[in-house]
Structure formats: structure tokens, C-alpha cells
Amino acid sequence: MAAEVTETAQPVETAASTDNNREQREPRRGGRERNPNRDRGNRDADKSQFLERVVTINRVSKVVKGGRRFSFTALVVVGDGNGLVGVGYGKAREVPLAISKGVEEAKKNFFRVPRVANTIPHPVQGEAAAGVVLLRPAAAGTGVIAGGPVRAVLECAGIHDVLSKSLGSSNTINIVHATVEALQQLEEPRAVAARRGLDYDRVAPEKLLQIEARAAEAAAAAKKAGAEKVGA
């Protein structure tokens, strides 16, 4: 009598099941799992928060053994339009990447610009190499009287009324850096008064004193109205 042989069916592993088992056994390299639902809104908010101005883009060629190798450089000005501004210089094989690098460098070079009623507190002169830029305060409604490179820096800094003059070199990079050097020389009136040992009223511009007087009157009126409302 022949012996009966019972065969047990073995599970067949498909490629998909093998990949799933492998993912369960082996963690991702780096120890962190990618979250497909992560919030990317912060990037868009960061981009919309700042003003970006591409001042100039240059193409640079390098001769190598196999021929010419091209790359691009971008000079970018970034600011919040409220007294914060920075300048960056990016280099890359593609234009968008060069601009992106310039923006990141500009954010690392941020500095604060003192302002008085949308203009600058006092005249300044900035120099960079052979480029010279003169900046002078202007009355309200004058606008930005400046060329392209200087205008880009001033608008990103939030200065809307100013007179400017560029002398010497017409190189765009020199003009931008001369403008930045001039803005970095600006001082608050209170800092100037403290350094010279003078009264604030003697140093501060008359326009600034008028603005501060109106602000103080408005604050006093609001405080008085609040006190009367509480008493009633």
C-alpha cells in the first residue's frame, strides 16, 4: 500500500511584499522618516515676508580642457520694506540657483537702517572701490530720486523719500556696496545726542520732533478717553 504524502503549500513572496517587509525591517538611512504631510507653508510665508530685487546677472565662462564651462553670478538685494535690508552675491551653473544663493547670503547680511518719516536722518556718503554714493534727506512726497542699483537698496530698506547721486565708477556691484556702506553710517538722533553730550531737541530733525509730539498727544488723548470710560 502506497504511503500518502501530504504537501503543505508554501507562501509565494511577490516583489511588492518583499519591499514592504524590507521597509518594516530596515529603518531609513539617517534615522528619520519622511513625512509626506509636512507643512510647507513656512517657506511660502518666508518668501512673501521679504522684498527681493535682482540687481544684475552676469555670465562667466571658464576655459577648460574640454571647452568652455559657463556659470552665472547674481547680485540680489533683500529687505522687509521696514528698515531691514541685506545684499548677497550668488554663483551657480544655473540662473535660478544663483539667485537663490544670493537671497540666502543677503539674509545673512541683514542690518537695520534708521529712518525718520520715510527718509534718512542726515546726509551720508558711502564709498566702495571707485564708486561713491551720496544720500540726502528729502521732503515727504519727493520719492526715491536714484538710479537702478541705488533704488533697489533704498526701496527694500523702506526709504521712500530721498535724494541720491552716484559718482566715480559705474560698476553695479560697487554702487550697491557703496549704498550699503552709506546706509550703515546712519545714526539715530538719540545716539548722536548721547555721544555729543547735547540735548535731544538740538540734534533731532524738526520733522521728527513734530511727529513725536503728535504721537504723544494722541497717546495722551487715548489714555484720557480710557480713564473716562472706566470712571463712567
From Swiss-Prot:
GO molecular function: rRNA binding; structural constituent of ribosome
Transmembrane segments: none
Region of interest called Disordered, as start-end residue ranges on this chain: 1-47
Name of a matching Pfam family: Ribosomal_S5_C
Cellular component annotations (GO), alphabetically ordered: small ribosomal subunit
GO biological process entries: translation
Biased segments, Basic and acidic residues type: 20-47
Complexes and interactors: Part of the 30S ribosomal subunit. Contacts proteins S4 and S8.
Full protein name: Small ribosomal subunit protein uS5
